[in-house]
Amino acid sequence: PQITASIGPSAGGAVYSPAMTDFVVMVDKIGTMFVTGPDVVKTVLGEEVSFDELGGAMTHGTKSGVAHFVVKNEYECMDRIKTLLSYIPQNNTEETSIVLNDDDPNRLDHNIINILPEDSIKPYDMKEIIYSIIDNHNFFEIHELFAQNIIVGFARMHGRTIGIVANQPLFLAGALDIDSSNKAARFIRFCDCYNIPIVTLVDTPGYMPGTNQEHNGIIRHGSKLLYAYSEATIPKITIVIGKAYGGAYIAMGSKN
């Protein structure tokens, strides 16, 4: 696995290398990445923009998706990388480490029934369900601020690392769009490369409609999610929590 820590300015050709690594951690107000700087943007387009607005940590963490993690300082950056390394193997030929804990794998969470609303139209927080089914309620989320209508991240079950992909009804009702399709597809392909099983929790009304999505290539980007699931040879377990309609049902790790 390759991990980038962005703790300073990076511009031009130097920004392509971080984008090709598996995970990018950016320090807020310090790390910046852009192909062309604010001066060039002003000269060519007449657009006034600051370093942070153009390529700061929050920009890449919430809009472009280049940053998988946005942290406050360098210490938090190193801690986040250490935690990430605890979930993944050293290379694609190894298995992930087993971390023993006192959480009974046969534990039943009777409160889970209270998380789901009786009215299927009402939103709920899918993360509450995730916390209830994993070891010690510890979930290491990836791309937390980007494409929040889908959740991806690492957790453990009975001490073994798993990847979790889940629709988030709190955002866009859990519908799939361009960004969420790319986010989930990339995560699935990483898990497939490094022998990490995937558990998928589904509650989605479909793909996001509209001219904006169609014109920007929802067909092309949406198909990446189907391809990632189809290509993956790791164990895949899918649980339909709520809605699963249309093409989004097929895309979210369905038996089809």
Identify the function of each model-found stretch.
Residues P1-N256:
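Ligand-binding clefts of soluble mixed alpha/beta catalytic domains
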